[in-house]
Amino acid sequence: MKHIVQQIHFIGIGGTGMSGIAEVLLNLGYQVSGSDLVEGAATKRLKELGAVIHIGHDPKNVGTAEAVVISTAVAGNNPEVLAARAAKIPVIQRAVMLGELMRLKQGIAIAGTHGKTTTTSLVASVLAEGDLDPTFVIGGKLNSAGANARLGRGDFIVVEADESDASFLQLFPAMEVVTNIDADHMDTYQHDMARLKQAFVQFIQRMPFYGVAVLCIDDANVRDIIPFVSQPILRYGLSEDADIRASNVRADGTRMHFTVERRTVRRHGNKPGPLNVTLNLPGLHNVRNALAAIGIATELGVGDQAIIKALSEFSGVGRRFQRYGDIPLASGGKFTLIDDYGHHPVEMAATLAAARGAYPDRRLVLAFQPHRFTRTRDCFGEFVQVLKNFDALVLTEVYPAGEAKIPGADGKSLMKAALVDDKTSKALLNSAAVAFASSVAEMPEKLGQVLKDGDVLITMGAGSISALPHTLSEAKHV
C-alpha cells in the first residue's frame, strides 16, 4: 500500500478505533492527518507523533490526501467526505484500513459482543511477555503501554473485530477469538438473531486453513454456531467439554485464582500440563477472557511462565473496572471509585458480580448513563433487573449518540421501573438511596446526597459519563 498511497486523512480521528490505526500508520512512516469536533487526549497524542490535526470539519482539511478513512459514525454528508468524493479520493471504512494493516502481519482478531477490549489487551500482553513483540490496535488504553495502539517488531498484529456494523467481515485474520454472541446493535442484522449468528460463522470461515478459532463454549450462542464451522477450533470456558478449561476458581479481592487444564493443543508437540494462574482482574467474565488469551498463547508456543507472569502482572485497560482509589466525602469518611465502560445489561451484570466478589461486605452504588435510546428500549427489562441489584442508584438521561428520543426508553422511565418490586409493587430502595441527575454535570451533587462512608461507587456508561471519574477524583471531596 505504501508504494501507492502515502498521505491518509481520518475523519473522526479522535475515536478510539480510528486513533489506534492512525498511530500505527504514523509509526510505519505514513503521512497522517485527521479532523475531529473536539480536541482530546487521542488527538493530542497523535499531534505529538507527527499527525496534522484539525478541530472541526472543513473541506480544506482533506488537503492532498490520497485516501480518506471514516467510521460508521461519520455521516455521508460530512463536508470532508463530500470534498473527498468530489476530488475522486477513495473514502474507505475504518475496518478496510484495519484489514490492510493486517495484511502486513499475521492477524489475530478478537470478536464478540462483550469483552473484546479486555481480551485483546490480555492477548497482546501475554504475547509481549512471550517475546513475540506484537503490534496491537485496541478499543481502550492498555495501561502498561499508555496507549491503545503500538507497532511491534514481531510477526503478529492483535486487533478488535467489530460486529456492531458487521465490519469484522472486512478482516482476514489467521487466528480468531469469539468471546460471546449477544443481542446488541441488532439494527445491523434486521433484528434477527439468526443473521447475527450467521455473520459470526462467516467471520470464522474467513480464516485460512492453517488458522484456529478460539471460541467460548460457555456462551450458548457460540455453542450453537460450532456445528456450522469447518475451520479448526479450540473451545474455552468453565464447561466440562472445554479444551482450555478453568477450575478451582476463587476470588481474592480484585484478583482471581484458578487452575487451567489444556486438553487439546494442535501445534507444539506434547499436551501441556496444568497452569495455576493468578489473574490481576476480578470476575468470572475476566477468567474467561484470560482463558482465550491462554489458548492463543499456547497455540503460538508461549512458555507457561510467560503466560503466568503476564496475567498476574496485568495492569488493566482504561475504563474496564478501572480503579481510582479512595475519594473523601464532604460528610466525612471516604468511598472507593471504580469506572467501567459497560453499557449493556450483560456487561453491567458481569461488573456487578465482579464488584460483589471483590468487595463482599460493602455497599455498591451505581452512577449510570444509559447509551442510545434504541438499546434502552430493546433491553429495558434487562436493564431494570440489573439496576435493582445495586444498593443505591444515581441515574441520568440517556446519551443519544445521534438517535432521536423514544418515549418510555429514557432515564426517568428506567429509574421508575427499577425502584418497584415486580411482585408487590412496593418501593425497593428508600428515597435516600436513589437520585436522578438531569445531566452528568449534576451527578457529583446527587452522589454527595447518596454516598456513605465505605461505599464502592461504580460509574458506568459509554457516553459523556466517561469524564465523571476524573471530575470526582480531582475534587477535594464529594
UniProtKB/Swiss-Prot annotation:
Keywords from the UniProt entry: ATP-binding, Cell cycle, Cell division, Cell shape, Cell wall biogenesis/degradation, Cytoplasm, Ligase, Nucleotide-binding, Peptidoglycan synthesis
Cellular component per GO, a single term: cytoplasm
EC number: 6.3.2.8
Molecular function GO terms recorded: ATP binding; UDP-N-acetylmuramate-L-alanine ligase activity
Catalytic activity: UDP-N-acetyl-alpha-D-muramate + L-alanine + ATP = UDP-N-acetyl-alpha-D-muramoyl-L-alanine + ADP + phosphate + H(+)
Pathway recorded for this protein: Cell wall biogenesis; peptidoglycan biosynthesis
Any one GO BP annotation for this protein: cell wall organization
SUPFAM superfamilies, sorted: MurCD N-terminal domain, MurD-like peptide ligases, catalytic domain, MurD-like peptide ligases, peptide-binding domain
Pfam family name, one: Mur_ligase_C
Class of this enzyme: ligase
Chief location: cytoplasm
Subcellular location: Cytoplasm
Record field: transmembrane: none
Binding site for ATP: G112, T113, H114, G115, K116, T117, T118
Family (UniProt): Belongs to the MurCDEF family.
Function: Cell wall formation.
Protein name: UDP-N-acetylmuramate--L-alanine ligase
Source organism of this protein record: Polynucleobacter asymbioticus (strain DSM 18221 / CIP 109841 / QLW-P1DMWA-1) (Polynucleobacter necessarius subsp. asymbioticus)
Lineage: Bacteria, Pseudomonadati, Pseudomonadota, Betaproteobacteria, Burkholderiales
